[in-house]
């Protein structure tokens, strides 16, 4: 008799728990898609890629010039005196160090700009998501990358992208 009562109590509790979870409305959102395919996100990415390519071209040209200077210096090694060679070699090392420093600073600047653009997008996206979840009685929004299998009706990505495009058509990056 004791076991029968325990069985009914456990069964009753399980049924209550499943009923409560059935009332929760859950949706999922592909954050990567939203950030990369919204108008503001695309504009920011295009700007950052263009900036990176311009810097890359400039640095490749500068690197080639440094390599040429190094080869010229090595070719003149037998002609130059030891002091002149040492002086030119030290000068070349300083140029290489400056080049590496400029390249690092350029990459850091682009990384910082990317992080700032992402942060701005997320700041604008947060109230849009809150408003949408309140209007549609959604209890929980999960990132799509954390969902193994889900009904496509629960995917709110395209709706949020449209709302984000309406609210933020472009993003300025400094």
Name each model-derived stretch.
Residues 23-147, 167-174:
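Amphipathic alpha-helical segments
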Residues 17-18:
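N-terminal signal peptide c-region/cleavage motif recognized by signal peptidases
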